[in-house]
UniProtKB/Swiss-Prot annotation:
Quaternary state and interactors: Homotetramer, a dimer of dimers. One homotetramer interacts with 1 SecA dimer.
Name of the molecule in the record: Protein-export protein SecB
Entries under InterPro entries matching the protein: SecB (IPR003708), SecB-like_sf (IPR035958)
Subcellular location: Cytoplasm
Keyword list, A-Z: Chaperone, Cytoplasm, Protein transport, Translocation, Transport
GO biological process, one term: protein transport
Any one GO CC term of the record: cytoplasm
Predominant location category: cytoplasm
Length: 175
């Protein structure tokens, strides 16, 4: 019986493992360069939103994944407010096949972090006493696929099948 338990533990030691260890707000800034004059404006503001994904290896099986949102709201040429926030998470990824690693870091991790970022950005904007702005849902798989297509186009498409097209975060290497 003890031998069976030991065999089960050994087999489980090689099983793929994906765990979220911690979620934290890495950076949040809000600027209102034209306050208080912007409170007198009656026009509808123009909103620009930019979303970026990043990551880095912290240890052999530990990665930091980040999602950054930059929201710039303008009325004519005046900046109403500028909010930039970075939500981060520490993930443990063990025994994950190399061909799946980039997709986990580029799609799954950001998808888990984004709701926290949305809430933090919305809270910051609400504190300006201006009308609330809630960021729309983001399809991180589509962003990931777009990034892969852009990289393939930059490389001129002369892949020759020798590379899988996997993009790893800075500081990581393929196993």
């Amino acid at each position: 019986m003890a031998e069976q338990d030991q065999n089960t533990q050994q087999a489980g030691g090689d099983a793929p493992s994906f765990n979220l260890q911690r979620v934290y707000l890495k950076d949040l800034s809000l600027e209102m360069p034209n306050a208080p004059h912007v409170f007198l404006e009656q026009e509808q503001p123009q909103v620009e939103v930019s979303i970026n994904v990043g990551g880095q290896r912290l240890a052999e099986t530990v990665f930091e994944s980040t999602v950054t949102a930059t929201v710039t709201t303008r009325i004519n040429d005046k900046v109403l407010y500028l909010v930039e926030g970075t939500q981060a998470g520490i993930f443990e990824l063990a025994n994950i096949p190399a061909e799946q690693m980039d997709a986990l870091l580029g799609i799954v991790c950001p998808t888990m972090l984004y709701p926290y970022l949305r809430a933090n950005v919305a809270d910051a904007i609400t504190r300006t006493s201006l009308p609330a702005l809630h960021l729309a849902e983001v399809n991180f798989q589509a962003l990931y696929e777009q990034r892969l297509a852009e990289l393939a186009q930059q490389q001129g498409g002369n892949n020759n099948g020798s590379d899988s097209g996997i993009i790893l975060p800075p500081g990581t290497t393929r196993q």
